[in-house]
Design a protein with these regions (language model features):
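Alpha/beta-hydrolase fold catalytic core
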Residues: 1-65, 88-90, 129-130, 321-325
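Catalytic histidine-centered segment of alpha/beta-hydrolase-like enzymes
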Residues: 300-309
């Protein structure tokens, strides 16, 4: 017979876990009610993909813009200030990366960053897009670079907004393998503890994300920030982080491909006050490693698509116009 103390402890743990799960479920549904889908879905071999598709190319030579958000982001990071402006001259497609926003992987598909790179080609084939310019913010920048390296005939240019270009810290292969083997742990955390904790700390976390810029008052709804409270989105972010070391090291090892003749043009914008990714270790380092033109900096933080849309639009237009020639 188990001791009374052990029985009480186990019962308390079960009650706490169920309470956290119910709380997470309620918060997830509330977030989805506040921030409903803003676009449409397409069925691809690997994913049921939610995207915003607006605008029309001003000429037959103009490429289509595909916008790729960062870690735990969603299409609203671009629809907040960028898409309407860009859609006046280009066809603009902003995607929810599977697991984020309202996109999801199909059953049996491995949830890898390389699969997200392959997704760019799937989108282009499905929508019959011949040449695209990729716009990547933060982790989305790394995915855009991976796609440019893998599909140079498809990608006509890359516009990077505060991109992740290499690992911020060194991760040992042993630690990376251990993290990859603990998916069950991330599932448990995302479905119980993570959402309630993030809800309590969300103001502080958002301030850190935007610093030193102010967080827009309507970021939670119009910027899609409340969707980050969903358990599925948190799990996708955990999986992205776990997969990042091995995948990004491989992408970095192929950066020389971006210096070869006929490679896609790469341009970059970085905030000198970025508190999430280092402008020097990520931006200046990459600009020196690869032929980045132009490489622009400004006095701003990390969330450039929401806080500095005019500068973002200018950079994207320059890349897209160059790809049209």
């Amino acid at each position: 017979m188990p001791s009374p103390f052990l029985s009480i402890t186990l019962a308390a743990l079960v009650i706490a876990t169920v309470t956290l799960w119910v709380t997470t479920t309620v918060l997830t549904r509330r977030a989805e009610a506040r921030v409903p889908p803003a676009g449409r879905w397409i069925d691809l071999p690997s994913a049921h993909l939610h995207l915003i598709d607006r605008g029309q190319a001003a000429s037959a030579q103009a490429p289509v813009l595909i916008l790729i958000h960062g870690l735990a982001g969603q299409t609203q990071h671009f629809s907040y200030r960028l898409i309407d402006e860009l859609a006046q001259s280009y066809r603009v497609i902003a995607i929810d990366r599977p697991g984020s926003g309202y996109s999801r992987w199909r059953a049996g598909v491995r949830h890898t960053l390389e699969a997200q790179v392959a997704l760019i080609d799937e989108i282009a084939r499905h929508l019959d897009l011949q040449r695209v310019v990729l716009v990547g913010h933060s982790l989305g920048g790394a995915i855009a670079l991976g796609a440019a390296i893998r599909y140079p005939d498809r990608v006509a240019g890359v516009a990077l907004l505060a991109p992740l270009t290499r690992l911020p810290i060194e991760v040992s292969p042993r630690l990376a393998r251990w993290l990859a083997s603990t998916d069950w742990l991330w599932r448990f955390v995302s479905q119980t503890i993570a959402t309630p904790m993030l809800r309590v700390r969300r103001q502080r976390l958002r301030a850190d994300l935007f610093a030193p810029d102010a967080v827009p008052a309507d970021y939670g709804v119009q910027g899609g920030g409340d969707l980050t409270l969903r358990s599925g989105q948190l799990l996708a972010a955990c999986r992205d982080l776990v997969a990042l070391p091995a995948w990004l090291d491989h992408v970095v090892s192929r950066y020389d491909d971006l210096r070869s003749p006929g490679c896609p043009a790469v341009a970059m914008l970085y905030g000198l006050q970025d508190a999430v990714l280092s402008p020097s270790l990520q931006g200046a380092w990459f600009a020196e490693r690869v032929q980045v033109s132009p490489y622009r900096t400004l006095d701003a933080g990390h969330m450039l698509p929401l806080t500095r849309p005019e500068a973002c639009v200018q950079l994207i237009r320059q890349v897209a116009d160059g790809a049209s020639r």
